[in-house]
Amino acid sequence: MTTFCISCDISYLDDMLQHMSKLGLSNFLILDRVLGKYPQGEPRLDSSIWPGYNAMIIIQVTEDEAEQLKTLILRINQESLTNLEYVYW
């Protein structure tokens, strides 16, 4: 088993969950209002200076599911218009 901590802008959470559902991944935890800064993009600190926040999905998967999830996240990031839309794990 592998544990993923997937983080994305809150506005992309529903899309991410739909993609995961198509892979048959339905057991997970969601942490709402996750604040922070990633290597790409601007900080999301839910403040007047750095608006916005992330959501985090925590999921345990098999090795096969882990490969599918990595492929999914890489594809989402390649199709992103800006680094503000990136999904991190």
Show which residues each predicted segment covers.
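Positively charged, small/polar-rich N-terminal and surface patches that mediate targeting and assembly
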Residues: M1-W89
